[in-house]
Amino acid sequence: VQDVNVKKQFIEEEQLLEEAFKLAVTIFDSGFRPDFIVGIWRGGSTVGIYVQECLQYLGVNTDHISIRTSYRGQPSYGELVDNPERIRVHGLQYLFENLNRGDKLLIVDDVFSSGYNVEAVITRLKAKCRRNMPEEVRVGVPYYKPDKNLSGRKPDYFLHTTEDWLVLPYELQGLTPEEIVQHKPDVADILSTIQQGA
């Protein structure tokens, strides 16, 4: 459950695209050349597509895949903080079959907050890949919330630190109709046609 006193920062689609390309250049400039890129669904998939595309343009060919995390019966993100072991990771079979010890793995998400999603992915990969688990695993995100981090892991690459409630371009849940009208007017127009037709 989000604190109503936390400031909402609305991220525009064009802004997220630019941040993803900047993240890719930051990764490239560091000298890291991933063999695999894993985007964590939902927002990490979007960022991962742009990171992969930019790295490929810069001559870094990668294998790339999107995976998903979920919470075992937990309807609320807030409950996750007290029960991180309840995170499930879906869609890893391709990685189990293709990762090797010498590979370099980049995990991408849109926001690194508690760190539990990334930690769950790495823990699950280590358990199943065992000796084939890549020795070099790095994490990249446009947005990092250090005060919310409970995992003991910090992203290797991030562009911004914030404690704001980030509202990403695709998000509608948790927004009031007034916020949608103000910050997502095109979406508000589309939604109003549905409501009128209902």
Regions found by a protein language model. Name each.
Residues V1-A198:
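PRPP-associated nucleotide enzymes
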